[in-house]
């Protein structure tokens, strides 16, 4: 079983990842009702979570475990929300319980966006704006490049979810650190496992 764990900058993250690695995503249930994006999400097998119901975590972890054991690639954003792309927020460990339960291999994925000059682009950032405002910001740009950096896999066997949250958060934070030059040519996933 394989799980992708990524930082979360924009609603574009899902569509960027899915073009490289067809995956099932975990998303807040509200997205189901969004125009167009809700329809897209439903049609790619998204697993929806009722975030206001604490007890829904048990159900969603079972759904993720089932998906993983049947061979589906599942992707999660453990920050639970989007950031401005300059920092990685604290990873919540709850959704990583499914990886522990099935001893999944976890691939940390660092996501960032660049503008035409190669600098970090703020246009895709989905923080304190409506979906329409976000789309408008993106459409005003002449060009945006998404960079998906797949780090070395993390074996979940023998680890707990908190340990996995800390480890994957640190890996992604280090990968996105300013010292690392943008446009580094990452290895292309042929959609993963080469263990």
Which residues make up each language-model segment?
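Catalytic-site beta-strand/loop segments enriched in glycine and acidic/polar residues
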Residues: 67-96
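Membrane-anchoring hydrophobic helices of lipid-metabolizing enzymes
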Residues: 1-2, 188
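C-terminal alpha-helix
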Residues: 170-179
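A conditional alpha-helix N-cap/helix-loop micro-motif detector
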Residues: 30, 54-57, 88, 128
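Catalytic core of membrane glycerolipid acyltransferases/transacylases, capturing the structured
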Residues: 2-54
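Generic beta-sheet signal
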Residues: 28, 49, 77, 109-111
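A cross-family acyltransferase "interaction/gating" segment
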Residues: 36-39, 86-163, 167, 182-185, ...
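A membrane-cytosol interface segment of integral membrane proteins
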Residues: 47-68
